[in-house]
Amino acid sequence: MDGWQRAFVLHSRPWSETSLMLDVFTEESGRVRLVAKGARSKRSNLKGALQPFTPLLVRFGGRGEVKTLRSAEAVSLALPLSGITLYSGLYVNELISRVLEHETRFSELFFDYLHCIQALAGASGSPEPALRRFELALLGHLGYGVDFLHCAGSGEPVDDTMTYRYREEKGFIASLVIDNNTFTGHHLKALASREFPDVDTLRAAKRFTRIALKPYLGGKPLKSRELFRQFMPARKARADNTNND
Protein backbone atom coordinates (compact mmCIF):
# COMPACT_ATOMS: atom_id res chain seq x y z
CA MET A 1 0.00 0.00 0.00
CA ASP A 2 2.10 2.90 -1.27
CA GLY A 3 -0.47 5.74 -1.42
CA TRP A 4 -1.00 8.32 1.28
CA GLN A 5 -3.70 7.59 3.85
CA ARG A 6 -5.22 9.46 6.73
CA ALA A 7 -4.31 7.74 9.99
CA PHE A 8 -3.98 7.86 13.76
CA VAL A 9 -1.48 6.05 15.98
CA LEU A 10 -3.36 3.91 18.49
CA HIS A 11 -0.33 2.66 20.40
CA SER A 12 3.45 2.58 20.06
CA ARG A 13 6.30 0.75 21.75
CA PRO A 14 10.07 0.60 21.32
CA TRP A 15 11.33 -1.75 18.61
CA SER A 16 15.10 -2.06 18.66
CA GLU A 17 17.28 0.83 19.80
CA THR A 18 16.12 3.29 17.17
CA SER A 19 12.74 2.10 15.89
CA LEU A 20 9.10 1.99 16.97
CA MET A 21 6.39 -0.63 16.54
CA LEU A 22 3.12 1.14 15.82
CA ASP A 23 -0.50 0.06 15.95
CA VAL A 24 -2.17 2.44 13.47
CA PHE A 25 -5.79 2.99 12.42
CA THR A 26 -5.98 4.07 8.77
CA GLU A 27 -8.86 5.24 6.61
CA GLU A 28 -8.38 2.72 3.78
CA SER A 29 -6.56 -0.27 5.30
CA GLY A 30 -8.11 -0.31 8.75
CA ARG A 31 -5.85 -1.33 11.59
CA VAL A 32 -2.26 -2.03 10.57
CA ARG A 33 0.98 -2.78 12.37
CA LEU A 34 3.94 -0.72 11.19
CA VAL A 35 7.64 -0.53 11.98
CA ALA A 36 8.88 3.06 12.01
CA LYS A 37 12.59 2.62 11.38
CA GLY A 38 14.82 5.21 13.01
CA ALA A 39 11.87 6.97 14.66
CA ARG A 40 13.55 6.85 18.09
CA SER A 41 16.85 8.29 16.93
CA LYS A 42 17.81 11.82 17.98
CA ARG A 43 17.84 13.03 14.38
CA SER A 44 14.38 11.68 13.51
CA ASN A 45 11.74 14.26 12.62
CA LEU A 46 9.00 11.69 13.29
CA LYS A 47 9.28 11.66 17.08
CA GLY A 48 6.71 14.35 17.69
CA ALA A 49 4.34 13.19 14.96
CA LEU A 50 3.93 9.52 15.85
CA GLN A 51 1.81 10.15 18.92
CA PRO A 52 -1.79 9.15 19.67
CA PHE A 53 -4.48 11.70 18.73
CA THR A 54 -2.29 13.41 16.11
CA PRO A 55 -3.98 13.46 12.66
CA LEU A 56 -1.50 11.95 10.20
CA LEU A 57 -0.92 11.22 6.56
CA VAL A 58 1.08 7.99 6.18
CA ARG A 59 2.59 5.81 3.47
CA PHE A 60 3.65 2.24 4.15
CA GLY A 61 4.49 -0.96 2.33
CA GLY A 62 5.90 -4.45 2.60
CA ARG A 63 4.68 -8.00 2.88
CA GLY A 64 3.50 -9.90 5.89
CA GLU A 65 1.51 -8.76 8.89
CA VAL A 66 4.02 -6.08 9.90
CA LYS A 67 4.56 -3.37 7.28
CA THR A 68 7.25 -0.69 7.03
CA LEU A 69 6.36 2.96 7.47
CA ARG A 70 7.69 4.85 4.43
CA SER A 71 6.62 8.40 5.32
CA ALA A 72 4.47 10.20 7.85
CA GLU A 73 3.33 13.80 8.14
CA ALA A 74 1.30 15.44 10.88
CA VAL A 75 -1.74 17.15 9.36
CA SER A 76 -2.22 19.26 12.48
CA LEU A 77 -1.20 19.38 16.12
CA ALA A 78 -2.38 16.59 18.41
CA LEU A 79 -5.97 17.01 19.55
CA PRO A 80 -5.81 18.42 23.10
CA LEU A 81 -6.85 15.64 25.48
CA SER A 82 -6.02 15.74 29.18
CA GLY A 83 -7.30 14.31 32.42
CA ILE A 84 -10.58 12.43 31.96
CA THR A 85 -10.68 13.08 28.21
CA LEU A 86 -7.16 11.65 27.80
CA TYR A 87 -8.13 8.44 29.59
CA SER A 88 -11.31 8.32 27.51
CA GLY A 89 -9.24 8.62 24.32
CA LEU A 90 -6.90 5.86 25.48
CA TYR A 91 -9.95 3.68 26.13
CA VAL A 92 -11.23 4.25 22.57
CA ASN A 93 -7.78 3.44 21.15
CA GLU A 94 -7.54 0.23 23.16
CA LEU A 95 -11.06 -0.76 22.15
CA ILE A 96 -10.15 -0.47 18.46
CA SER A 97 -6.91 -2.39 18.98
CA ARG A 98 -8.75 -5.20 20.74
CA VAL A 99 -11.77 -5.72 18.49
CA LEU A 100 -10.74 -4.84 14.91
CA GLU A 101 -9.03 -7.44 12.75
CA HIS A 102 -5.80 -6.46 11.00
CA GLU A 103 -6.04 -4.90 7.55
CA THR A 104 -9.84 -4.88 7.37
CA ARG A 105 -11.23 -1.68 5.92
CA PHE A 106 -13.48 0.39 8.18
CA SER A 107 -13.56 3.77 6.42
CA GLU A 108 -16.83 4.94 8.01
CA LEU A 109 -15.65 3.86 11.45
CA PHE A 110 -12.46 5.87 10.89
CA PHE A 111 -14.57 9.02 10.70
CA ASP A 112 -16.66 7.92 13.69
CA TYR A 113 -13.34 7.67 15.55
CA LEU A 114 -12.26 11.11 14.34
CA HIS A 115 -15.56 12.66 15.42
CA CYS A 116 -15.28 10.96 18.82
CA ILE A 117 -11.77 12.27 19.45
CA GLN A 118 -12.78 15.75 18.29
CA ALA A 119 -15.79 15.64 20.62
CA LEU A 120 -13.56 14.58 23.52
CA ALA A 121 -11.09 17.37 22.75
CA GLY A 122 -13.88 19.95 22.72
CA ALA A 123 -15.85 18.54 25.65
CA SER A 124 -16.64 21.01 28.41
CA GLY A 125 -18.67 18.44 30.34
CA SER A 126 -18.77 14.67 30.60
CA PRO A 127 -17.05 12.59 27.90
CA GLU A 128 -19.66 9.85 28.36
CA PRO A 129 -22.02 10.80 25.47
CA ALA A 130 -19.14 10.76 22.94
CA LEU A 131 -17.93 7.39 24.24
CA ARG A 132 -21.37 5.80 24.10
CA ARG A 133 -21.97 7.05 20.54
CA PHE A 134 -18.64 5.63 19.41
CA GLU A 135 -19.25 2.27 21.08
CA LEU A 136 -22.64 1.99 19.38
CA ALA A 137 -21.10 2.95 16.03
CA LEU A 138 -18.36 0.36 16.53
CA LEU A 139 -20.90 -2.36 17.30
CA GLY A 140 -22.82 -1.44 14.15
CA HIS A 141 -19.70 -1.69 11.97
CA LEU A 142 -18.88 -5.07 13.52
CA GLY A 143 -22.23 -6.34 12.24
CA TYR A 144 -23.95 -6.23 15.62
CA GLY A 145 -27.48 -5.49 14.43
CA VAL A 146 -29.98 -4.79 17.21
CA ASP A 147 -33.50 -3.44 16.80
CA PHE A 148 -33.94 -1.06 19.72
CA LEU A 149 -37.38 0.11 18.64
CA HIS A 150 -39.36 -3.15 18.51
CA CYS A 151 -40.02 -5.96 20.97
CA ALA A 152 -38.33 -9.11 19.65
CA GLY A 153 -41.13 -11.25 21.03
CA SER A 154 -44.19 -9.47 19.62
CA GLY A 155 -42.77 -7.15 16.97
CA GLU A 156 -44.66 -4.28 18.58
CA PRO A 157 -42.99 -0.86 19.02
CA VAL A 158 -41.37 -0.49 22.44
CA ASP A 159 -43.31 1.41 25.09
CA ASP A 160 -41.48 4.06 27.13
CA THR A 161 -42.86 2.75 30.42
CA MET A 162 -42.35 -0.98 29.83
CA THR A 163 -39.26 -3.01 30.71
CA TYR A 164 -37.40 -5.19 28.20
CA ARG A 165 -34.78 -7.86 28.77
CA TYR A 166 -31.85 -8.03 26.36
CA ARG A 167 -31.14 -11.47 24.92
CA GLU A 168 -28.03 -11.92 22.80
CA GLU A 169 -28.76 -12.67 19.13
CA LYS A 170 -32.50 -12.10 19.72
CA GLY A 171 -32.97 -8.54 20.90
CA PHE A 172 -35.22 -7.05 23.55
CA ILE A 173 -38.16 -9.00 24.98
CA ALA A 174 -40.80 -7.65 27.38
CA SER A 175 -39.98 -8.58 30.98
CA LEU A 176 -41.48 -8.17 34.45
CA VAL A 177 -38.10 -8.71 36.12
CA ILE A 178 -35.75 -5.74 36.53
CA ASP A 179 -32.00 -6.41 36.63
CA ASN A 180 -28.75 -5.46 34.88
CA ASN A 181 -29.97 -6.90 31.56
CA THR A 182 -33.25 -4.99 31.44
CA PHE A 183 -33.98 -1.59 29.94
CA THR A 184 -37.06 0.61 29.68
CA GLY A 185 -38.54 1.55 26.33
CA HIS A 186 -37.32 5.09 27.06
CA HIS A 187 -33.75 3.76 27.35
CA LEU A 188 -34.07 1.83 24.09
CA LYS A 189 -35.29 4.86 22.16
CA ALA A 190 -32.29 6.82 23.46
CA LEU A 191 -29.97 4.03 22.28
CA ALA A 192 -31.61 4.00 18.85
CA SER A 193 -31.18 7.77 18.42
CA ARG A 194 -27.77 7.87 20.17
CA GLU A 195 -29.02 10.87 22.11
CA PHE A 196 -28.75 10.76 25.89
CA PRO A 197 -30.63 13.67 27.49
CA ASP A 198 -30.08 12.67 31.12
CA VAL A 199 -27.90 10.66 33.50
CA ASP A 200 -30.35 7.75 33.52
CA THR A 201 -30.16 7.16 29.76
CA LEU A 202 -26.37 7.53 29.81
CA ARG A 203 -26.09 4.88 32.51
CA ALA A 204 -28.39 2.58 30.56
CA ALA A 205 -26.30 3.08 27.41
CA LYS A 206 -23.14 2.23 29.32
CA ARG A 207 -24.75 -0.95 30.68
CA PHE A 208 -25.81 -2.01 27.21
CA THR A 209 -22.46 -1.37 25.50
CA ARG A 210 -20.63 -3.24 28.29
CA ILE A 211 -22.89 -6.25 27.71
CA ALA A 212 -22.65 -6.06 23.91
CA LEU A 213 -18.87 -5.58 23.75
CA LYS A 214 -18.04 -8.34 26.23
CA PRO A 215 -17.99 -11.17 23.62
CA TYR A 216 -15.50 -9.18 21.51
CA LEU A 217 -13.20 -8.40 24.44
CA GLY A 218 -13.18 -11.85 26.03
CA GLY A 219 -12.10 -12.21 29.63
CA LYS A 220 -9.06 -9.93 29.41
CA PRO A 221 -9.70 -6.58 31.16
CA LEU A 222 -8.99 -3.29 29.41
CA LYS A 223 -5.83 -1.62 30.71
CA SER A 224 -7.29 1.85 30.12
CA ARG A 225 -10.18 1.14 32.50
CA GLU A 226 -7.73 0.22 35.26
CA LEU A 227 -5.70 3.38 34.61
CA PHE A 228 -8.91 5.41 34.81
CA ARG A 229 -9.85 3.79 38.15
CA GLN A 230 -6.42 4.76 39.50
CA PHE A 231 -6.75 8.29 38.13
CA MET A 232 -10.15 9.09 39.68
CA PRO A 233 -9.15 8.79 43.40
CA ALA A 234 -6.02 10.86 42.74
CA ARG A 235 -8.13 13.48 40.94
CA LYS A 236 -10.59 13.63 43.85
CA ALA A 237 -7.73 13.96 46.36
CA ARG A 238 -6.26 16.89 44.39
CA ALA A 239 -9.68 18.57 44.28
CA ASP A 240 -10.15 18.09 48.04
CA ASN A 241 -6.72 19.58 48.74
CA THR A 242 -7.51 22.57 46.54
CA ASN A 243 -10.83 23.14 48.32
CA ASN A 244 -9.09 22.98 51.71
CA ASP A 245 -6.46 25.58 50.79
Curated annotation (Swiss-Prot):
One of its GO terms (biological process) is double-strand break repair. Keywords: DNA damage, DNA recombination, DNA repair. It comes from the Bacteria. Gene3D superfamilies: Nucleic acid-binding proteins, Recombination protein O, C-terminal domain. GO terms for cellular component: bacterial nucleoid. SUPFAM superfamilies: ArfGap/RecO-like zinc finger, Nucleic acid-binding proteins. HAMAP family: RecO (MF_00201). PANTHER family: DNA REPAIR PROTEIN RECO. This is DNA repair protein RecO. It comes from Klebsiella pneumoniae subsp. pneumoniae (strain ATCC 700721 / MGH 78578). The lineage of its organism: Bacteria, Pseudomonadati, Pseudomonadota, Gammaproteobacteria, Enterobacterales. The gene is recO.
